[in-house]
From Swiss-Prot:
Source organism (scientific name): Mus musculus
Its job: Catalyzes the first committed step in the biosynthesis of complex N-glycans. It controls conversion of high mannose to complex N-glycans; the final hydrolytic step in the N-glycan maturation pathway.
Underlying gene: Man2a1
Keyword Membrane among UniProt keywords: yes
Pathway note: Protein modification; protein glycosylation
Protein name: Alpha-mannosidase 2
Cytoplasmic side: 1-5
KW Zinc (keyword) present: yes
């Protein structure tokens, strides 16, 4: 009977899928591309081409639907096996017995139609695919003559007879918000004078132009200037003499920031511009980030930009693009099925953005046209020939010399419109430079423009002036539907500016602050969401103590400090020591102030009678359970003081948009503890020792861990009191390689001289074996009972003995990584408990811990890995964690870009070791036809795969010398640094490896996406400080901010309160930012237990929030700059895969 029922279920499922597949093909067969925003791709010409395209498309659909049927068949079989096996509890650990845990959800959660996107992505050919470009380039670096990294450029004198060369000389000043000086010091010494002189000198002549990028500096100057000067700036913007480019808070790094922070600093800058200047930037300007990410191109496109410019790209790629005239291209996302993400990008062709490298290929000549370097000044030309002031006597010869460079540079492009930037770091701070540059160039312009035989039109311009002229020229010569510019997909990492000098060191430099940055992002997002919803309650109940609080001002300051840290010399770890301290102090202060906002907002939301709300300006009612004592110290758990008489209240916030089963761990002062759920029932608790050091157990603190089930964006209240409880269980310990006895106290601690037999821990999904050093050796996935080699080891990289060595920017190793060697077997501590088990290995420079949670669901399916790294006593070394497996990834691996998308990588033997290191923001993985091994990260670091089956992650680097890129120091201010990871091993199904090798795109699984989100957005436990003020103060037992979980593939990026148009307060609107993630379905699905489903990107917003009415919802551009002309109030949103969409939302508490 049971077997018959299983076949009925299976047969019904197959029947439904076949019928659905036929419907899907009929519905879509006449289309070449999916509906929605990606219909813009170019269509084939001619009837035969169209017919062939349709046949190919139907073949793809048949293959995709066969794949769906295969996946569902596997799922039904797995489901029937689960029924056959009966319910499975946790096997627990031998010493602990068993424990009843939540059963997994049904495994089949993804709508089969949502699986089509990943299989189609990358099917559209590009003109330029960066993975292919790497195959084409020899990377041989021959001497190119005056253009050392290029080639000799020639032209014919009559090439401009029919169309003159149009040159835009673009004055600019690159102002780092911190590098060799702090942000404030640079402003005091340089930047304020640049602005002041800009106003004076641009007003002198309407033909003069200037560009500005960093809004952090502009906002600081705006606060101290008078109204006439403000009006002058507005006038300059209005008449086109001044242009704001990009308009973010900073010019961010593009390798290490998460897309959350990239968007946030863009919004902060654009909101400031809208409020104070009423301008909307059109063009992106990124001349100094050390490599470029397509994520930034996508964000600019969705913010409403038409064009962008980049500079720091590998010199061999610049040469290749110059030879093929592909320096200007439409940058298209790898995953785009059409052309909806195209943005016109200009790549500067030469070594640097300074004046010697921007007029043409010969820096010796171009330097002579940087008039700040005239004899008698502080700067000269390193090529030995100084500039000459322009006079009637030399203007002809000097103009000819400069025009020759312009013409040669123009030969690298496809039009006769040329961009010639004129600037450098902190330029135009003195009025004398304005005079020298402007007056000398004005004489050159005047002469050139007055000589028809020169066939040139030259003027000062801005970046948009250039792009406008470029588009006009292209429109004039466009004769067919084919674009003048190629479509390009891929990224521009890893950057090298010369020789084998790859800038892969900064992916890891100062990792302490990279981790602090990610914590800050999670906290600011939590604060934004809680504050917006608490604000609506406060407005409804007229709670003036909340409404009049400085929370919005504090939140704005935190946004700006986070934005400042995305600067390309901040999060990168490439600033002077004291500048790093300044950044760290800003983050630290904002973390503290965010805790107050989170605590006060959560307290109001969880309070039953809102009118009883009180606020102490000096502290929050609800306090975080961790405290960081200084900007460079690790966060520590506070110890909650318990008593038997009065319970302590613990409020746990789930900042994630799905309901969640996760472990909460807190510290208390008593081992006899009872935790009561919101229903008043005791919950299962693991009481673990708090270790003062390797062998000493604290008598003052105990760790209490329990499983909490919290609704999406939900707050839940637990009561904790000192009491004997049958639901409380002590953890057991085994100490290996222990040469001294540990004090047991109340815990059972077993001492072993050495490990002897293998050390093992397990949970319902995984069993792990460790060697006698406490390092992982192999893993068994209980889903299929197969054992997999999975070895963890640590390595050292040194630095080369050549003249140029590793520094803050560069990674220049002395060869392959060398194994970390301990003189004797390290001390190993094994914890086994009801809620979790772990193995901790104590090496001299790393405390390495692998933990398994004994829970069903998402967090039970991966291994948590934490490393406390301390290399403060080493010299010129970099420490790496390597994970080795038998996966045959064939030199192909994958790293994410900005936590947004996955970029395939290849380990290339023709490149040096350091070139094969890439940025990893949230994950890296390797795979073969059967398995995928993913390392998920809670901080940005460098990652690589130096051999088949391996993933390496760089954890810290200590370098004693400068690497000659301007910093003037090494990196030796190392901190004790906590790195946090998860390792996920997944079984793949229905994989075509040949197709996969050709694909320029890849996607995480849904399980991987959610594991990453859990890692980066942990539960936030908060303790009620003291007791409730009076019996009238009652807390709700639970308050879900959402009515139900969002679809599995939709992430609520932020709910950001929008500023008021007047004053410094808030408006009644918020920015709702949603991201629909692309995911891969080719994984065995048994037991995943996702707490959500997918819905083809459709979501009703009217039913989104719990007890908050949506009064209006209007689509907007990403950074709130633009609203569609036909924007209307919406009740349902429909998101395409991979898209990030912003809406203006107005909420009201009901």
């Amino acid at each position: 009977m049971k077997l018959s029922r299983q076949f009925t279920v299976f047969g019904s499922a197959i029947f439904c899928v076949v019928i659905f597949s036929l419907y899907l093909m009929l519905d879509r067969g006449h289309l070449d591309y999916p509906r929605g925003p990606r219909q813009e791709g170019s269509f084939p010409q001619g009837q035969l081409s169209i017919l062939q395209e349709k046949i190919d498309h139907l073949e793809r659909l048949l293959a995709e639907n066969n794949e769906i049927i295969s996946n569902i068949r596997d799922s039904v079989i797995n489901l029937s096996e689960s029924v056959e096996d009966g319910p499975r509890g946790s096997p627990g650990n031998a010493s602990q017995g068993s424990i009843h845990l939540h059963s997994p959800q049904l495994a089949l959660q993804a709508d089969p139609r949502d699986c089509l996107f990943a299989s189609q992505s990358g099917s559209q050919p590009r003109d330029v695919q960066m993975l292919d470009v790497y195959d084409l380039i020899p990377f041989d670096n021959p001497d190119g003559g005056v253009w050392k990294q290029g080639f000799d450029i020639k032209y014919e004198a009559d090439e401009w007879d029919h169309e003159p060369l149009q040159v835009f000389v673009v004055p600019h000043s690159h102002n780092d918000p911190g590098w060799l000086k702090t942000f404030n010091d640079y402003f005091r010494d340089k930047t304020q004078y640049i602005f002041n002189n800009m106003v004076l000198k641009l007003k002198e002549d309407s033909s003069r132009k200037f560009m500005w990028s960093e809004i952090s500096y502009l906002a600081k100057w705006w606060d101290i200037i008078d109204i006439p000067k403000k009006e002058a700036v507005k006038s300059l913007l209005q008449n086109g003499q001044l242009e704001i480019v990009t308009g973010g808070w900073v010019m961010p790094d593009e390798a290490t920031p998460h897309y959350f922070a990239l968007i946030d600093q863009l919004i902060e800058g654009h909101q400031w511009l809208e409020k104070n200047l009423g301008v909307k930037p059109r063009s992106g300007w990124a001349i100094d980030p050390f490599g470029h990410s397509p994520t930034m191109a996508y964000l600019l496109k969705r913010a409403g930009f038409s064009h962008m410019l980049i500079q720091r790209v590998h010199y061999a790629i610049k040469k290749h693009f110059s030879l093929h005239k592909t320096l200007e291209f439409f940058w298209r996302q790898n995953w785009d099925l059409g052309s909806a993400t195209d943005i016109l990008c200009h790549m500067m062709p030469f070594y640097s953005y300074d004046i010697p490298h921007t007029c043409g290929p010969d820096p010796k000549i171009c330097c002579q046209f940087d008039f700040k370097r005239l004899p008698g000044g502080r700067y000269g030309c390193p090529w030995g020939v100084p500039p000459e002031a322009i006079s009637p006597g030399n203007v002809q010869s000097r103009a000819q010399m400069l025009l020759d460079q312009y013409r040669k540079k123009s030969k690298l492009f496809r039009t006769k419109v040329l961009l010639a930037p004129l600037g450098d770091d902190f330029r135009f701070s003195e009025y004398t430079e304005w005079d020298l540059q402007c007056r000398n160039y004005e004489q050159l312009f005047s002469y050139m423009n007055s000589q028809p035989h020169l066939k040139v039109k030259i003027q000062f311009g801005t970046l948009s002036d250039y792009f406008d002229a470029l588009e006009k020229a292209v429109a004039a010569e466009k004769k067919s539907s084919q674009s003048v510019f190629p479509a390009l997909s891929g990224d521009f990492f890893t950057y090298a500016d010369r020789d084998d000098h790859y800038w892969s060191g900064y992916f890891t430099s100062r990792p302490f602050y990279k981790r602090m940055d990610r914590i800050m992002e999670s906290r600011i997002r939590a604060a934004e969401i809680l504050y917006q919803l608490a604000l609506k309650q406060a407005q409804k109940y007229k709670i003036n103590k909340f409404l009049s609080s400085p929370h919005y001002t504090t939140l704005t300051e935190a946004r700006r400090n986070l934005g400042l840290f995305q600067h390309h010399d901040a999060i990168t770890g490439t600033a002077k020591d004291w500048v790093v301290v300044d950044y760290g102090t800003r983050l630290f202060q904002s973390l503290n102030s965010l805790e107050k906002i989170i605590g006060d907002s959560a307290f109001l939301l969880i309070l039953k009678d809102k009118k009883l709300y009180q606020s102490d300006p000096s502290k929050a009612f609800l306090e975080m359970d961790t405290k960081q004592s200084s900007q460079d110290s690790l966060p520590q758990k506070i110890i909650i003081q318990l008593s038997a008489q009065e319970p302590r209240y613990l409020v746990v916030y789930n900042p994630f948009e799905q309901e969640r089963h996760s472990v909460v761990s807190i510290r208390v002062n008593s081992a006899t503890v009872k935790v009561l759920s919101d229903s008043g029932k005791p919950v299962e608790v693991q009481v673990s020792a708090v270790w003062n050091d390797m062998r000493t157990i604290s008598q003052a603190a105990y760790e209490v861990s329990f499983l909490a089930h919290i609704p999406p964006l939900g707050l839940k209240v637990f009561k904790i009191l000192e009491s004997q409880s049958s639901s409380s269980h002590l953890a057991d310990y085994v100490l290996y390689n222990n040469d001294g006895l540990a004090e047991n106290g109340i815990f059972h601690v077993k001492n072993m001289v050495d490990a002897g037999d293998a050390i093992t821990i397990e949970n319902p999904f995984l069993a792990i074996w460790f060697d006698r050093s406490g390092l992982m050796e192999k893993v068994r996935r209980k889903e299929d009972s197969r054992q997999h080699e999975l070895k963890v080891q640590f390595l050292w990289y040194g630095t080369t003995n050549k003249r140029d060595k590793s520094g803050a920017y560069l990674f220049l190793p002395d060869g392959q990584g060398q194994p970390y060697v301990s003189l004797r077997p390290p001390f190993v501590r094994v914890t086994r408990g009801r809620i979790y088990s772990d193995v901790t290995c104590f090496l001299e420079h790393v405390t390495h811990k692998v933990r398994l949670y004994n829970i069903q669901g998402i967090e039970g399916q991966s291994m948590e890995v934490s490393n406390i790294v301390n290399i403060r006593n080493v010299h010129n070394r970099e420490i790496v964690m390597r994970i080795s497996s038998k996966i045959n990834n064939q030199n192909r691996y994958y790293t994410d870009l900005n936590g947004y998308q996955i970029q395939p990588r290849r380990t290339m033997s023709k490149l040096p070791l350091q070139a094969n290191v890439y940025p990893m923001c949230t994950m890296a993985y390797i795979q073969d036809a059967e398995h995928r091994l993913t390392l998920l990260s809670a901080q940005s670091l460098g990652a690589s795969s130096m051999a088949s089956g391996q993933i390496e992650v760089f954890m810290d680097r200590r370098l004693m010398q400068d690497d000659n890129r301007g910093l003037g120091q090494g990196v030796h201010d190392n901190k004790i640094t906590a790195n946090l990871f998860r390792i996920l091993l997944e079984k793949r199904s229905a994989v075509n490896m040949e197709e996969e090798k050709k694909s320029p795109v890849s996607y995480p699984s849904l399980l991987s996406h959610m594991t990453s989100s859990f890692l980066n957005h942990p539960f936030l436990p908060m303790v009620l400080s003291g007791q409730l003020p009076s019996p009238a103060f009652e807390l709700l037992s639970e308050f879900p901010l959402l009515q139900s979980s969002l679809p599995c593939d939709i992430h609520l990026v932020n709910l950001r309160t929008i500023q008021s148009k007047m004053g410094k307060g808030y408006s009644d609107e918020a920015a709702l930012i949603l991201h629909r993630k692309g995911f891969d379905c080719q994984f065995s699905s048994r037991g995943i237990g996702l707490p959500c489903s997918t819905t083809q990107g459709k979501m009703s917003v009217l039913k989104l929030f719990n007890k908050f009415a949506v009064e209006s919802l209007v689509p907007s551009s990403l950074s709130l700059m633009h609203s569609p002309p036909d924007a209307q109030n919406m009740s349902e949103v429909s998101l395409s895969p991979m898209e990030i969409s912003t809406f203006r939302i107005r909420l009201r508490w009901t």
